Amino acid sequence: MNLRPRCRKWLPLATQQLRLRNLNRIQGFNIESWPHEKSLELDDPDDVLLYYTLHTDKASEAFYTSEKLPQRHQQQKWAEICTDDEAWRKTNAQCVCVKVWKHYSAERRDGQPPEVEQRHKDVFGRSQLTPSRLPRPPELLFSWGVYFSGLIPLSPLTLSQCGRNCLVFQLNGEQFASPSMISEQALQSQLHLHYQKYAEEEKLEEPQDEGINSPAVSRSSSPVLRMSTMRYAQLKCQRQEIRRSNNLEKLLTLQRLQRLHQQKRRQMAEVCREIARLSVHCVTRNELRLKPRTTSLSGDYSAHQYHSMGRALSVLLAEQQQIAPLTLYNAQQLTRRIEALSSQQRLLKAERETFRQRNERTRQLLKEMREQREAQQWELHSQRHRLEKERLELRTLAPQHLEQRDQKRQIERQVERRMSTLVLELQEIYNIQNVGGRQFSICGIAFPHMEQYTSESRQAANAQLLDNVSPLAVSAALGYVAHLVQMLAIIMDRPLRNRILYEPSKARIVDDIKELTYTTREFPLYTRSILPSQQTKYAIYLLRQNVSQLCFDITGQCDLRNTFGNLLELFSTLRYIERTQRDEVDERDGTAVGAGCGEARLANGLTAPHLSQSHSSVDMNHVPLPTGVNAVKDALLQQLLPPGVSEALAIEGYASTQRICRSVGSYSDGEDEFRPRLEHNYSNSDSNITLQTERS
């Protein structure tokens, strides 16, 4: 493995190390290749080969395998460990795992001579092998985990007294073994030899710390183990057995010179290879015309005139066998060609490797794309199945949807028609007429134009107009208008901007939106004087806002100053809607039934003569209940309108009903309750500004 140590025997010095790089040989003693319970069929010892392997640990691969030798009972001598591995030479490992194997030879398995076995093998081959003729794998006999500092040196006399399956390690010219593999008698003789070598008068006083680098490797109290594993800093030896060594400086110098020598040798080898490579390239075409020389050029002065230094080197290198210049030239051309081809080969290899990696990446990408495509195909397939199911369901539900849509449209038309009918009936209840002079009447009660009534100007026309209007009539008319607006909002299902608190002639309106300086948000829609108060004017202004809101929401246009005009426009629009839908129903149902009757029916089921014969004193409790289509409309109206309202609005079968005004007597609450109580703070609301006449 490495150079042998210069000392003739091993000394237990603290500076002398036991490492894996110092291992030279391993020997085996008393190795048994079969268990104690011998089977009926024993192996022939000549067929069994023993060898060992070295491992860094029990589970690692073997980094060294010895030769296979036939089994010998007493001593198994394997060859020295020889390796050129630099890692082995420089290793600093203090332990190693040794495994001993049993190998079966395949030449003499069936008891025949090797010549006959080889002839049979050549003839028949290995086509018909029985289980008894198949090669058997090697078997592990035992394995050791060896820590070199725990081994003890052995004397030649002690080797014969080793135990079963004992391994002996040769380190630094000395043989070491495990103390557990040595018998007690051998240990006693080993102790005797130790005392003879290191007598008390020949060695120094033993230190208190049991020497340098001498840890307790065993828990045993045996003096033999303690003395065999001890390391000493100094030892007394015979003078004739000691040879003086170099100091540290000289050793470092020798090491440096050895390194320089090795470096020079490597450089010389590189120069020789370069000379051998370039010697052929020195031949030129001019030298080919010269005659080839058969002798050396050394000593010939004229040779330097015709030959270059490269030629001289070529001749010197080829003195043993002269080569013709033409041959050298051909060799030069071939060498150049070979170098060019080698360069091309390297380039092609690099390009092939590049294309191989590119193809590998492309194949990987193609594989991923295929997987993605398959996943997408599967997803699309499942989505298509789901789509087909949904399409079938939609095709099944399409007629129902069309039928429901037609029903919805029909119901919407019926609801609109019913709303229009109810609103027109409200118009019949609260009949609004223009009595001339920009005055209107509701249920026979005259009411002036609201813009003039709420105007702040003191013109003679306004004063005369106000003198002709009674406060009680104004209160009753405002109550009718408030109730009409509230009923319109309920029937048309429209929220009002300003909430109305209806009490026939004492109605009030609430402003919940603006910031007010008044202490209350309820404003009266009645008055007791000819000139209305500020609260009454503001209440009329809020009522006009509600009317304008409804008119704009239904008709799309409104005039805030013309309250009764907005109501009349609203009634005209709803009458047109009701008439149009009635014509559509009549066209769909056919005109034959209408022609047979000779008279057209209105929305409430009555004819025009019935409407002309109506009277305001008709008792609503004695109106006959509707049948047929009207019953369906009433049921639909009860579902659409809020509870409590549908019952009050489902009035059908009468032509005209006039509401008799509730007489307004003395009011219990006066206008003093709604005196403006202005706060002293400032507000951005437009309600605290004095209402003026709205002008276009």
Swiss-Prot record:
Residues 681-696 have a biased composition (Polar residues). Keywords: Coiled coil, Growth regulation, Notch signaling pathway, Phosphoprotein, Transport. Disruption phenotype: Larval lethal at 3rd instar. Adult viable flies exhibit genitalia-specific organ rotation phenotypes. GO terms for cellular component: endosome; lytic vacuole. GO terms for biological process: imaginal disc-derived male genitalia morphogenesis; negative regulation of cell population proliferation; negative regulation of Notch signaling pathway; neuron remodeling; Notch signaling pathway; phagocytosis; positive regulation of receptor-mediated endocytosis; protein targeting to lysosome. The modification Phosphoserine is found at residues 214, 218, 666, 668, 685. It comes from the Eukaryota. One of its GO terms (molecular function) is SNARE binding. Residues 251-278, 330-394 form a coiled coil. Residues 666-696 are annotated as: Disordered. The modification Phosphotyrosine is found at residue 667. Involved in biosynthetic vesicle transport to lysosomes. Acts as a cell growth regulator. Also has a crucial role in controlling organ rotation by regulating membrane-localized Notch receptor endocytosis and subsequent degradation. Regulation of organ rotation is not by induction of autophagy. This is UV radiation resistance-associated gene protein. It comes from Drosophila melanogaster (Fruit fly). The gene is Uvrag.
